[in-house]
């Protein structure tokens, strides 16, 4: 099972809530939230595509350091385009697409967001809570 878990989707779709629910079930797991990384390590970046790619590269580097030490890592960020996903190396991650909303709260992100072609789990708005989704998501990690 892959140790790097990417939780991606539009802003406001529930990525961080799901990340916390998975973390609570898995216990000793490192989480990287893109908003926190952007407000500290990458506070100089804008939201241009070039800087979004740099943000994805940073998220990849951080998560790769965690998994190199034999830990699981959750990375919670929008990852809106094929270019940002390639920069993150998403095919070497367990990808969870949180697809619970049609539009996010930022128009510029809505305009560039491309639904992923590859994902392991697609979280939809079917009435289940983040905790219920998390229970289903973590099962293969321990089965």
Task: Give the positions of each predicted feature.
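The conserved Walker
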Residues: 10-11
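Residue-level preference for the first positions of well-ordered beta-strands
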Residues: 2-6, 28-30, 72-74
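Glycine-rich phosphate-binding loop used to anchor ATP phosphates in small-molecule kinases
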Residues: 48-103
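NTP-dependent small-molecule kinase module
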Residues: 5, 21-25, 91-94, 115-143
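Short loop/helix-cap segments at secondary-structure boundaries that form the rim of catalytic
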Residues: 86-91, 106-107, 112-118
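Conserved substrate/cofactor phosphate-moiety recognition/catalytic segment
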Residues: 19-62
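Conserved lysine of the Walker
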Residues: 15
